[in-house]
From Swiss-Prot:
One Gene Ontology cellular component annotation held by this UniProt entry: chloroplast thylakoid membrane
GO terms for MF: NADH dehydrogenase (ubiquinone) activity; quinone binding
Segments passing through the bilayer: 9-29, 40-60, 89-109, 125-145, 147-167, 185-205, 219-239, 258-278, 280-300, 327-347, 354-374, 396-416, 425-445, 546-566, 607-627, 723-743
Protein encoded by which gene: ndhF
Tagged with keyword Membrane: yes
Family, per entry: Belongs to the complex I subunit 5 family.
Protein name according to UniProt: NAD(P)H-quinone oxidoreductase subunit 5, chloroplastic
Enzyme type, top EC level: translocase
Origin organism lineage: Eukaryota, Viridiplantae, Streptophyta, Embryophyta, Tracheophyta
Function: NDH shuttles electrons from NAD(P)H:plastoquinone, via FMN and iron-sulfur (Fe-S) centers, to quinones in the photosynthetic chain and possibly in a chloroplast respiratory chain. The immediate electron acceptor for the enzyme in this species is believed to be plastoquinone. Couples the redox reaction to proton translocation, and thus conserves the redox energy in a proton gradient.
Species: Carica papaya (Papaya)
């Protein structure tokens, strides 16, 4: 067993040869490297598979009772300072390593087909391998300096992949936005690390926790300074895990390729923030104000992410806000001190969300056969619908991922989310009400995405019902460069409808132009008018290379929840996760054995599942297919004609829609206050520098010039005149000097 741990330092570096060799190959042998590009995908998958096997072996050792292992190498040693590098293998490291490698392998397999037609294929795999290396280095780090180094490398790789299609201005802007937003959190993290070193004199986690808690217990350090350092440390995870108020970069990060969206949202960048808070939880526990702040930020993010997802039309942006909300649940659990529940939800959510993102990529891939290579169209749920018969396997896998995220048993996220909801009632009833309400919103917006995508009819074809051809087509080159051509806005999504722009429809029931009395619009859905080529092609199912990782993720979604089921009946113990995390931190169940019987479990789960089903029912009520076979919608029509109450309801719904569609106006606020303020300050500084600073300098020069010119003409260009003026000024100076001395004498 000991020899296994001795080689654990190799874990982060095993995938590293791929980006190194790829870079050298493209530099020295570009043609041969490009011709053998499938080999690089195989090598990336093979090396990451080695890490996965290694990680599983280490996890088995941890479950069977092995203690944590740490090995360090001293880099610089003197009497006052010692800097060490090392690796730490404990349950948290084992969990994260398995998560990164399993999701990473499946995403790499998926990417081999998804990115096969992209000229940046090799560049993509180089970035991905370096991304996995950076994340593995982060989770195996034994000290804060090492964490910060890999933390920045993880961020760098994410920026490269978000802006992968850098010739598209919107992708370049998304990359810059992610970079600037994370700079705020990373600067706080760096200051917090330096502050902790100033207090404790150590970067190593084990020494840091022991010294820090002893100083607090003995009141040997100022509590405000300690709180400030902990707050600055927490700022890093707030930005990296897209927590309020530094969440604004996450939806725009969807401009990167879909496979990287799956990896970022499941097991790498956003998971890094949750990992760091979990790693530093023994430090945060000693500061109650910070623990409350963590839970407060978590519950705000839970609610904000869910409300912002309600009206998104882009399928990937809807899933991005879903990720933001679920990360809020994890942060809430950590703030409550429920360490096990947070990590459990991190695991279950990772596989479910990876499945959903890969499913969305398959949907986008199939839609591109109809609308072309345009994210504006291929990701727009308004133009989808009726995909069930075209992509049945993708539909089934996406449905299972949706049900899991909604918290429907026995799928993975049900077990972890239910545990967080139960713990929230013990922590704060207010937080619990918000968390449970958001569980209903989660079910609503996830089934909204599902119904808009798969139910009904393929809406893009109804735009072409008139049979007219349009030469306008919006395409993206293989590098992602946009090619915009004129757009005809005379088409309507629903066929045979005429739009009267003078009539202003309410939001909940927009003006109904019925065909056979069976057409209605759906809430949280505004319909743009795109002009596309008249074509009768249909979406098609993705190839096996894309479907295989999705089917494997279905298995994880079905069964990974079993590792944390807290049942202990007749000596049968299912709770593998608790064995792995022994001893575990849980401030809410300090005197319990973490096991419940079946009756107590069903009693606790019934409420949360009922809320989820209520959200699903509302989604079905509002978003069932517009082209329904039902001829009588008297119930819906009577609901729509209710006088003053109807107007008030419309105002409420319109407010919610505007709030969600405009991202809670938070981006607008940042644009006006921060971006606009900084630009205004820059312009003011530029004006002051040009007019005042340069004015003084130039004024002195101009004044000296005119004085010199004046003296030149007074002297008449004769040396004797210059000497006379010189003597005259000297006499005046001496006269003033002696006159002042005389005054001082008297």
């Amino acid at each position: 067993m000991e020899h296994i741990y001795q080689y654990s330092w190799m874990i982060p570096f095993i995938p590293l040869p791929v980006p190194i060799l790829l870079g050298m190959g493209l530099l020295l042998f570009p043609t041969a490297t490009k011709n053998l590009r499938r080999m690089w995908a195989f090598l990336s998958i093979f090396l990451l598979s080695i890490v996965m096997i290694f990680s599983i072996d280490l996890s088995i050792q941890q479950i069977t009772g092995s203690s944590a292992y740490q090995y360090v190498w001293s880099w610089t040693i003197n009497n006052e300072f010692s800097f060490e590098f090392g690796n730490l293998i404990d349950p948290l490291t084992s969990i994260m390593s398995i998560l990164i490698t399993t999701v990473g392998i499946l995403v790499l397999i998926y990417s081999d087909s998804y990115m096969s037609h992209d000229q940046g294929y090799l560049r993509f795999f180089a970035y991905m391998s370096f991304f996995n290396t950076s994340m593995l280095g982060l989770v195996t780090s034994s000290n804060l300096i090492q964490v910060y180094i890999f933390w920045e490398l993880v961020g760098m790789c994410s920026y490269l992949l978000i802006g992968f299609w850098f010739t598209r201005p919107i992708a370049a802007n998304a990359c810059q936005k992610a970079f600037v937003t994370n700079r705020v959190g990373d600067f706080g993290l760096l200051l917090g690390i330096l502050g902790l070193y100033w207090i404790t004199g150590s970067f190593e986690f084990q020494d840091l926790f022991e010294i820090f808690n002893n100083l607090i217990y003995n009141n040997q350090v100022h509590f405000l300074f300690v709180t400030l350092c902990a707050f600055l440390l927490f700022a890093g995870p707030v930005a990296k895990s897209a927590q309020f108020p530094l969440h604004v970069w996450l939806p725009d990060a969807m401009e990167g390729p879909t496979p990287i969206s799956a990896l970022i949202h499941a097991a790498t960048m956003v998971a890094a923030g949750i990992f760091l808070v979990a790693r530093l939880l023994p430090l945060f526990i000693g500061i109650p104000y910070i623990m409350y702040l963590i839970s407060l930020i978590g519950i705000i993010t839970v609610l904000l992410g869910a409300t912002l997802a309600l009206a998104q039309k882009d399928i990937k942006r809807g899933l991005a806000y879903s990720t933001m909300s679920q990360l809020g649940y994890m942060m809430l659990a950590l703030g409550m001190g429920s360490y096990r529940a947070a990590l459990f939800h991190l695991i279950t959510h990772a596989y479910s969300k990876a499945l959903l993102f890969l499913g969305s990529g398959s949907i986008i891939h199939s839609m591109e056969a109809v609308v072309g290579y345009s994210p504006v169209k291929s990701q727009n749920m308004v133009l989808m619908g009726g995909l069930t018969k075209h992509v049945p396997i993708t539909k089934t896998t996406f449905l299972l991922g949706t049900l899991s995220l909604c918290g429907i048993p026995p799928l993975a996220c049900f077990w972890s989310k239910d545990e967080i909801l139960n713990d929230s009632w013990l922590y704060s009833p207010i937080f619990a009400v918000i968390a449970c309400s958001t569980a209903g919103l989660t079910a609503f917006y996830m089934f909204r995405i599902y119904l808009l995508t798969f139910d009904g009819h393929l809406n893009i074809h109804f735009q072409n019902y008139s049979g007219k051809k349009s030469s306008s087509f919006y395409s993206i080159s293989i590098w992602g460069k946009e090619e915009a051509k004129p757009i005809n806005r005379n088409f309507c999504l629903v066929p045979l409808l005429t739009m009267n722009n003078n009539e202003r429809a309410t939001f909940f029931w927009k003006k109904a132009y019925q065909i056979g009395s069976n057409v209605r619009n759906r809430t949280f859905l505004s319909i743009p008018h795109f002009a596309v080529k008249t074509t009768f092609s249909y979406p098609h199912e993705s190839d096996n290379t894309i479907l295989f990782p999705m089917l494997i993720l279905v298995l994880f979604t079905l069964f990974v929840g079993a590792i944390g089921i807290p049942f202990n009946q007749e000596g049968i113990d299912f709770d593998i996760l608790s064995k792995l995390l022994t001893p575990s931190i849980n401030l809410l169940h300090q005197n319990s054995n973490d096991f419940v019987d079946w009756y107590e479990f069903f009693k606790n789960a019934t409420f949360s599942v009922s809320i989820a089903f209520f959200g699903i029912f509302i989604a079905f009520f509002l978003y069932k297919p517009a082209y329904s076979s039902l001829q009588n919608l008297n119930l819906l029509n009577s609901f729509a004609k209710r006088g003053p109450k109807r107007i008030l309801w419309d105002k409420i719904i319109n407010f919610i829609y505007d709030w969600s569609y405009n991202r809670g106006y938070i981006d607008t606020f940042y644009t006006i206050s921060l971006t606009g303020g900084i630009r205004g300050l820059a312009e003011l500084t530029h004006f002051f520098d040009r007019r005042v600073i340069d004015g003084i300098t130039n004024g002195v020069g101009i004044t000296s010039f005119f004085i010199g010119e004046g003296i030149k003409y007074v002297g008449g260009s004769r040396i004797s005149s210059y000497l006379l003026l010189y003597l005259f000024y000297v006499l005046i100076f001496l006269f003033i000097y002696y006159f002042l001395n005389l005054l001082n004498f008297f």
